[in-house]
Amino acid sequence: MSYSVCAYLTEADKVKSVYGTCDNQLINQLKVALKQELDTLNDYFSDSLNTDKDAYAALADIVNGEIRYPEIAFMYGYVYEKICNHYGTQIYCAENLWQLDSQSTFIPIPLSDDFPYIISIPVSDLESKRTEYTSLQEGNGIGDYDYEQ
């Protein structure tokens, strides 16, 4: 088994504006725009879901500003990732970033104890984070993973 890190440069205000709007038109627009991704999530996690608790339900909860199924926190996290990608673009070469910060999101969703591990950094913090990340020495979460373990 392996892990991957996906980093997105996204418009935080757009992501934040999705949460709690209670806008059925927005739900429908996002369902159409993210259909392939949401269906893929549902297929991948089919053994952990039932018909009421799926990626579409998590999306509706996010837009409606409610969390009906905290037991599938992982799904809220993956749907959040899809929303970030929808309003932004994926960036690469971010393999070690997940070790550097505690989980955070632009919207109040439950965070999984496992995966996905989410770190949302506002633009106003990017320069200080860049300085922090580039000043790290090997062994502090950078270049110290033993792939043979």
Please place each PLM-identified region on the residue numbering.
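Acidic (Asp/Glu-rich) sequence patches and key acidic residues
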Residues: 1-148
